[in-house]
Amino acid sequence: GVITGFATILDYPFYIVAQNFKVLCGGISKAQCDKIAKCIDAAEKNATPVIYLLNSQGVQLGEGVTALEGLAKVLMRATQLKGVVPQYAVVNGEVYGSLATLCAIADFTFFTKKSYLAVNSPLVIAAKTGKDVKKEDVGTAQALDKTGLVSFVTEGMEEIREKIAEITEIVSSPMLDAELNDAVPALNNADKLNAAAIAGMLENAVEVNALCAPEAKTYLCRIGGIAAAAVVFDGGENAAELNAGNLAKVREFAEFA
């Protein structure tokens, strides 16, 4: 039901946790949770990032409370790992139930056009509300655009692999010596200065969480060979206004940085 292992992307090492949806629709069991927790412990011990490939309809009914105990263990281990090494969550299909919380703990969450994420499945929500609820209404990247959970929306696994490689290249590569006092004449041209122009001045800039509060752009990048996090406000013709949404986005990004 769940496969754990070790792999490399561009020679960078990663621990992998992958759910097999073909086994009981990815149903979570206590044994699977113990296996995932063991993989997370190994990642912490070896200071190696983790990639979670998630695809689950929830816990196995026959497991009862023991499965919930296992999930609590996994979420606790992942929370303890936060800030130690990067964690990447890939919503590789439909993910419902408490395991969806793992995407909120991870540093980066990847969606595709076939990704759906929700703590309560559409069937559960429909039963509680008495309304016809479709998974497109509650679990897509667009439906979750204000939550800050969707770091990237991609076309498929190959693009996800490339994004993970780009991020790892930024945060893991050794610091390079460079002149930090270089003049940037383009900054004096206020009429043409926008988020895209500023991003072009950064090295290897990768925009994170573009769907949430789009007037506040957040980038991982390098400046003078040093890994950096950049926040650029761009309200278009009008100045961007600070509000709860974009401030929450900036705060979470700053905490990761």
Show where each model-derived region lies.
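Extended active-site and interfacial segments that coordinate phosphate-rich ligands
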Residues: 21, 29-43, 103, 107-108, ...
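Short coil/turn segments at secondary-structure boundaries
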Residues: 23-31, 62-69
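Intrinsically disordered, low-complexity segments enriched in small/flexible residues
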Residues: 1-13, 25, 140, 146, ...
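A structural preference for short, pocket-lining loop segments at secondary-structure junctions
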Residues: 6-20, 35-61, 221-234, 248-257
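Short, well-ordered loop/turn elements at secondary-structure boundaries
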Residues: 9-11, 45-47, 84, 104-106, ...
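Short acidic loop-to-helix transition motifs that present clustered carboxylates
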Residues: 35, 93-97, 214
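A generic local secondary-structure boundary/capping motif
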Residues: 4-6, 39-42, 75-79, 99-100, ...
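Conserved catalytic cores of soluble enzyme domains
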Residues: 54-174
